[in-house]
A protein has these predicted regions:
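A short, Lys/Arg-enriched amphipathic alpha-helix followed by its capping loop at the start of a domain
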Residues: 27-39, 128, 279-287
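Active-site and donor-binding regions of nucleotide-sugar-utilizing enzymes
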Residues: 22, 27, 33, 79-207
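A nucleotide-sugar donor-handling region in carbohydrate enzymes
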Residues: 175-273, 294-299
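Conserved N-terminal ligand/cofactor-binding loop architecture of enzyme catalytic domains
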Residues: 29-120, 296-301, 308, 312-315, ...
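Gly/lys/ser-thr-rich phosphate-binding loops in alpha/beta enzymes
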Residues: 1-55, 184
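Donor-nucleotide binding loops and adjacent catalytic segments primarily
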Residues: 244-339, 346-347
Length: 363
């Protein structure tokens, strides 16, 4: 994998995401220290973005948010979502075959780029040419089309991907991909990306939840979590020697079993959070269980929780007005979380932090 940092010289890179759902920003957040300003640039809302560029991005975002919530409308909602979902479908992995033919959606993206979409962003980045790391495919395509002079890296925050992630002509593209798993690496090759441009790195996880190279923070949190999840020591009875070798002696449980339910960026499934609280009301009342509901940066989701819970003061609600504050609060709360409950998303990779995950139905 290409190194962006060494002991002698700290190298910098532009880190670019989009604020369309949390996945692209969550995977960029741990890389923000590489940026000259220590922050992530959002390609769809950066300072000074031309109105014509903003309109293209906003049309896409509005449609995504609308279709995610409209799905709950009986019959017609599910039909509309099925049509949308089909346009983004990931073709079956087997049999192995050439899947490099570009989709209509990808061609449409490039048509906008050829008409000037993204040129302003790339010209601004050219003023201080640094390696470009983006967690969304469109800025990578823009950079390549407008001859960005430095390396272009695309971080993939998904366990499997559609053809949209590979360039129009993938065999000639110089975009390099950082992928979270071997399936995604193989998928890119089916789409025509050269194996030389694919690097299996895993998903970027927050440093504050890991610690240094010794992973002291992660191991300490995992020890406490394991004690909470195994109060009768059944797991420890079987794997105790391995636990002691890797983590040391387990502490006694020091908190109620803590469940975090995370709502997606579009605000869908907030009703499930309220249902969870109501079903565990007795255990909440007795102090046996603690629940954390994650509203993210969606004020309407926080308000929904407050208005629909009988005793909202018994529940912790994570909400922030800006994305960085939200990620900070979320990562801090994760350290004292025993079970993460969420829909299939980038948070699935957080199992690597030693977090068991309950998977809600996909949207």
């Amino acid at each position: 994998m290409p190194k962006l940092e060494n002991k002698k010289t700290k190298k910098e890179a532009w880190v670019v995401a989009v604020d369309m759902g949390y996945g692209h920003q969550r995977s960029a957040y741990p890389l923000r220290h590489l940026s000259p300003q220590g922050r992530v640039i959002n390609a769809n809302s950066y300072e000074g973005i031309p109105q014509k560029d903003r309109r293209i991005w906003e049309a896409s975002k509005r449609f995504y948010d609308f279709i995610s919530t409209f799905r709950r409308v009986p019959v017609i909602g599910k039909l509309a979502f099925a049509i949308f979902d089909r346009s983004q479908r990931i073709l079956s992995f087997y049999p192995s075959r050439d899947l490099s033919k570009p989709t209509f959606q990808l061609k449409q993206n490039y048509n906008f780029i050829k008409k000037g979409w993204g040129k302003d962003l790339i010209e601004k980045l050219k003023e201080k040419p640094l390696p470009l790391i983006t967690t969304f495919f469109t800025p990578a395509f823009m950079a390549e089309f407008y001859d960005y002079p430095e390396e272009i890296y695309c971080v993939i925050p998904d366990a499997d991907i559609s053809r949209s992630w590979a360039a129009l002509n993938p065999k000639k593209s110089r975009i390099k991909y950082f992928v979270p798993n071997s399936r995604t690496a193989e998928r890119l090759q089916l789409y025509g990306v050269s194996p030389d441009n694919i690097f299996l790195t895993g998903f970027p996880l927050p440093k504050e939840n890991i610690g240094g190279e010794d992973m002291a923070v992660l191991k300490g949190d995992f020890k406490q979590r394991l004690a909470n999840l195994d109060p009768q020591k059944r797991y420890y009875g079987t794997y105790g020697e391995m636990v002691k070798r890797e983590l040391g002696e387990l502490p006694s449980p020091s908190r109620p079993l803590t469940i975090m339910f995370a709502v997606g960026g579009a605000g869908a499934q907030k009703e499930l959070g309220v249902e969870i609280v109501k079903n565990l009301a007795e255990k909440l009342k007795s102090g046996e269980v603690k629940i954390i509901l994650v509203a993210g940066i969606r004020k309407e989701v926080r308000n929904y929780f407050l208005e629909n819970l009988d005793n909202p003061e018994k529940v912790d609600i994570i909400f922030a007005k800006d994305i960085n504050s939200y990620f900070g609060k979320f990562n801090e709360a994760l350290r004292k979380t025993d079970i993460l409950w969420t829909k299939p998303s980038e948070l699935s990779f957080y199992s690597a932090l030693g977090l068991p995950i309950l998977v809600a139905p996909p949207i």
